[in-house]
Amino acid sequence: MSMLVDVSYFISGPRQIRNATTAKMPTAEGLSANNVIYGYIRSFQRKFLNDVVGFTLAGQITDYLEIIENESPKTENDTVSPYEYVCRQLRESFADYVFYHILRDMNTDATVTGLIQLKSSNKHVSPLQRQVSTWNTMVERNKQFVCWASSDECPFKVNVNKNLLIPINSFNL
């Protein structure tokens, strides 16, 4: 499956995940972190696209991503696909969406008797607060996408799920 984002969105900055790397020869920890990230991207990409552009366009974008993965590199004279314009608008928002889900899932560990909250000696920021701020950043990016999609610059009609436009708080209200 071709992906809207890759691990490079998670190696530095506010979405940094420890040990994530773009190195050609990653360490075992780097490889493990990258595999987790790619697993989340694969798991959530189609749902995100369905929710942010609608089912039909999500399928077309997925097909486009498959095609460009198998094509030879573009030259300066090649025209940019209308799908690429949409992908460019969505990449940062999708990276936030993936990071939100990683934070949510990595904060607890499932056992037979229930969920256990993980403790860490190097915990500096409450995972819940980080989740809230990541979600709300994604919401702001999605609102910008809606403005762009409503303009003449967007080559497609999109149908955004309103849940992706609603900020959250630490009380889940």
Predicted region positions:
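Conserved short "hinge" loops at termini or chain/domain junctions
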Residues: 1-91, 105-113, 117, 124-133, ...
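Catalytic-loop motifs flanking and including active-site residues across diverse enzymes
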Residues: 94
